[in-house]
């Protein structure tokens, strides 16, 4: 798969997405507000998440391609809505940076000069609506997101509450919450491919683990709107509240220089260690 296609699928993983599955069940015993409250409790608590101002993930993407089956990535997030995403494939490097208002993308190819481009209008809209650190449900009122209960489905054999999240922009997302664990099973949104017709992008959240008392999915599987199969983002390590300068999320200037993550060793493919390793699966 090309870096362009991988980038689209990987970033779709960091923005909640998915398609409805199953039929509506009987009337739900819980309200949307109660489901959201139980979700926050299951993930470690609302106040605990409010204390997280920055986060760094490192791991790899399983592409399913024999050419580059595993591609290392580092994803940095800082409130209120700053992100930096870096992929490395052999001698190629792709970086996407969003400072909360504007975004840029840089690609360095083998033997070629780095190319810097601004985000497209569609990419900007997507980045501005991302809820990277804690997702759509946690602290949704502070984010201006309205949550409503839309029914009950079965997702991969598990009963799930289907919620509709309406963002400030008016765009909608669907979120399926496990009726037993109250963790997210999948989400969806409408997305445009290279064609003119929109499609539904689906993201499944798997292998939830406790990291410093907070629950996070460590496998995020994305199925793109064009239906060209799926990819898995596997999060191997997470750092909570690292020191991240705002310069990490500014317009890249020195395109030829690799900046190591603050406080971490610079690592090549296959060695993306961060100081905090995930605990056993819960």
Regions found by a protein language model. Name each.
Residues 104-134:
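Acidic/charged, solvent-exposed loop-and-adjacent secondary-structure segments enriched in E/D, K/R, S/T
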Residues 22, 90-92, 152, 156-255:
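Gly/Pro-enriched, hydrophobic low-complexity segments
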Residues 1-10:
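Bacterial N-terminal signal peptides that target proteins for export
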Residues 26, 33-111, 144-149, 154:
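N-terminal mature ectodomain segment of secretory-pathway/periplasmic proteins
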Residues 54, 136-149, 197-203:
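A short, amphipathic edge element
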């Amino acid at each position: 798969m090309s870096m362009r296609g991988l980038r689209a699928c990987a970033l779709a993983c960091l923005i909640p997405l998915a398609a409805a599955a199953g039929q509506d069940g009987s009337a739900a015993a819980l309200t949307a507000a109660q489901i959201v409250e139980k979700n926050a409790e299951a993930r470690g608590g609302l106040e605990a998440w409010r204390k997280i101002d920055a986060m760094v993930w490192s791991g790899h993407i399983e592409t399913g391609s024999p050419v580059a089956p595993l591609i290392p990535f580092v994803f940095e997030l800082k409130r209120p809505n700053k992100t930096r995403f870096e992929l490395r494939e052999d001698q190629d490097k792709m970086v996407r940076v969003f400072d909360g208002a504007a975004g840029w993308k840089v690609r360095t190819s083998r033997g070629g000069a780095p190319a810097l481009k601004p985000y497209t209008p569609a990419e900007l809209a997507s980045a501005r609506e991302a809820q990277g650190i804690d997702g759509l449900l946690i602290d949704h009122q502070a984010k201006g997101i309205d949550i409503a209960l839309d029914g009950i489905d079965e997702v991969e054999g598990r009963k799930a509450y289907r919620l509709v999240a309406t963002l400030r922009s008016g765009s909608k997302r669907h979120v399926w919450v496990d009726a037993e664990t109250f963790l997210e099973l999948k989400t969806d949104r409408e997305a445009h491919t290279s064609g003119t017709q929109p499609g539904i992008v689906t993201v499944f959240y798997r292998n939830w683990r406790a990291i410093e008392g907070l629950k996070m999915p460590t496998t995020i599987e994305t199925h793109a709107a064009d239906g060209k199969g799926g990819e898995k983002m596997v999060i191997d390590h997470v750092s909570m509240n690292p020191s991240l300068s705002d310069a990490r999320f500014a317009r890249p200037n020195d395109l030829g220089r690799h900046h190591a993550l603050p406080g971490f060793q610079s690592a090549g493919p296959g060695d993306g260690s961060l100081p905090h390793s995930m605990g056993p699966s819960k």
